[in-house]
């Protein structure tokens, strides 16, 4: 993919496997965030949740992966997200990335995208945007 071939409106969508408690624990280990509400149902219930839930940054990481896979790992110049809803065991998340603009800045060809992560019911857990630098 090059700057000349990417067009405003181009889109990538990726569906991820259903979330599991094991994924939450693995993410805790990778991130160092061992807040027990992400892996202990008793603690999650004590703070008003029906069960454990995924880290917001786990959802963000899935979105970043779609951007990285499309444009390349060195291409990401900016990534900004807003966490909207929690994700739960069994949720099937879909990330959609849509090109919203192209521009040249500081000698780089930049592509702006909007991104969303939503569950199987269409409920958004993450919304944001990113900028990637691409070759001519």
Where in this protein do the model-derived segments appear?
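Hot-dog-fold acyl-thioester-processing enzymes
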Residues: 1-75
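HotDog/MaoC-like acyl-thioester-processing domains
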Residues: 1-12, 86-136
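Hydrophobic residues in beta-strands and at strand termini
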Residues: 16-19, 83, 134
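Mid-chain, well-packed structural core segment of small domains
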Residues: 69-95
């Amino acid at each position: 993919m090059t700057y000349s071939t990417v067009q405003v409106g181009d889109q990538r969508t990726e569906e991820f496997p259903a979330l599991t408690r094991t994924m939450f624990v693995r993410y805790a280990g990778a991130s160092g965030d061992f807040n027990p509400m992400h892996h202990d149902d008793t603690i999650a219930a004590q703070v008003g949740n029906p069960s454990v839930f995924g880290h917001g940054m786990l959802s963000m990481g899935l979105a970043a992966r779609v951007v990285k896979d499309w444009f390349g790992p060195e291409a990401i110049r900016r990534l900004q997200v807003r966490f909207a809803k929690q994700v739960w065991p069994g949720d099937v998340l879909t990330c959609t990335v849509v090109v919203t603009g192209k521009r040249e800045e500081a000698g780089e060809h930049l592509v702006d995208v909007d991104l969303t992560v939503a569950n199987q019911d269409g409920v958004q857990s993450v919304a944001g945007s990113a900028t990637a630098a691409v070759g001519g």
